[in-house]
Amino acid sequence: MAQFYSAKRRTTTRQIITVSVNDLDSFGQGVARHNGKTLFIPGLLPQENAEVTVTEDKKQYARAKVVRRLSDSPERETPRCPHFGVCGGCQQQHASVDLQQRSKSAALARLMKHEVSEVIADVPWGYRRRARLSLNYLPKTQQLQMGFRKAGSSDIVDVKQCPILVPQLEALLPKVRACLGSLQAMRHLGHVELVQATSGTLMILRHTAPLSSADREKLERFSHSEGLDLYLAPDSEILETVSGEMPWYDSNGLRLTFSPRDFIQVNAGVNQKMVASALEWLDVQPEDRVLDLFCGMGNFTLPLATQAASVVGVEGVPALVEKGQQNARLNGLQNVTFYHENLEEDVTKQPWAKNGFDKVLLDPARAGAAGVMQQIIKLEPIRIVYVSCNPATLARDSEALLKAGYTIARLAMLDMFPHTGHLESMVLFSRVK
């Protein structure tokens, strides 16, 4: 009779090596060298020595994890959040704000091959005015989880506090948890969004099954007692207003209305400073014609219109164009027009572009603006401000402007998301005469 033997499981002992960290990358990972290879080690800071084991070994680099830290950097901080290290939201609470800003600025300078002239920043804590919290019902405990995703996982970290949220939203977390955990429908809840607008606080609840009248009544009572504007979302397309009027926020002296699902910059303080800096960099004059590409609902467009002769905002999403037009009317601005266009096509042939533009601002999504760089060059503006949420696509797009005779006059790191690996930036290009 044949006999079958199970194969012996291979056991490998990972070698412990001692490294010295000399840099911090923009994602908050310590950078060290070992045997001629770059090592990325989460949790370590420059000037720290540690025993580590390699977890991933590639041809050009390797990743490692800390076994034992042997020394502490003078810029090491005690994380404020008890969930830090498990929650995927923040990566850099263990580093001083100054070190975070220096490392991000250095990464930006390397990509752009140009010195970073300034950092545009605001308060490092309590800055986030929007949060989307995942909801998950646990049948064994009959409890509702509410929180953010774990780092590198779809599992939820059940958060009790979040010090990067604006204080009004952080204070709401236990109350929202208690309310949602008391609903009959807690098995059928997807996520809850909290937004702090100038007009007040919004709560948007995504539910995957119809709510009972008792649940609706509980939610309405909760929204009234906490002074919230309540919105219910039975699917991704429908949004029911239960209480509250059109929300709005202040932007450089103007009032911008938005729909609860519209994109708004989550850091109000940096947004205000960013818009003010963009206007200063463009040096907008009363006779200028200014073009704002990827304009959204007018975050830059409307403040520009307070200083220029005329402003054209161009956006690829029709609903945002309508919102921009509405915001222009609400603020009594008659020298600004919004257009819905496919920005991958040649917009320079449109009637509104025939007189050209003196200045151009663009604020594209992460994919960048490769399709419009040649169009901007055709317009021959004197100054261009490019606001970026992805330094890699910014560096790529900048090459076209540099080849066309523009130079980088100013480069700023926008500290829009302190304690995270997100790096945003703003560049001023000037045309060489």
Curated annotation (Swiss-Prot):
Pfam family, one: TRAM
Domain TRAM: 10-68
Residues annotated as binding [4Fe-4S] cluster: C81, C87, C90, C162
Keyword Protease tagged: no
Active site: C389 (nucleophile)
Highest taxon of the lineage: Bacteria
GO molecular function terms attached to this record: 4 iron, 4 sulfur cluster binding; iron ion binding; RNA binding; rRNA (uridine-C5-)-methyltransferase activity
CDD domains on file: AdoMet_MTases
Catalysed reaction equations from the record: uridine(1939) in 23S rRNA + S-adenosyl-L-methionine = 5-methyluridine(1939) in 23S rRNA + S-adenosyl-L-homocysteine + H(+)
Binding site for S-adenosyl-L-methionine: Q265, F294, N299, E315, N342, D363
Keywords tagged on the record: 4Fe-4S, Iron, Iron-sulfur, Metal-binding, Methyltransferase, rRNA processing, S-adenosyl-L-methionine, Transferase
GO biological process assignments: rRNA base methylation
Keyword Transferase: yes
Assigned EC number: 2.1.1.190
PANTHER family: 23S RRNA (URACIL(1939)-C(5))-METHYLTRANSFERASE RLMD (PTHR11061:SF49), RNA M5U METHYLTRANSFERASE (PTHR11061)
Similarity comment: family membership: Belongs to the class I-like SAM-binding methyltransferase superfamily. RNA M5U methyltransferase family. RlmD subfamily.
Known function: Catalyzes the formation of 5-methyl-uridine at position 1939 (m5U1939) in 23S rRNA.
Name of the molecule in the record: 23S rRNA (uracil(1939)-C(5))-methyltransferase RlmD
Organism: Shigella boydii serotype 4 (strain Sb227)
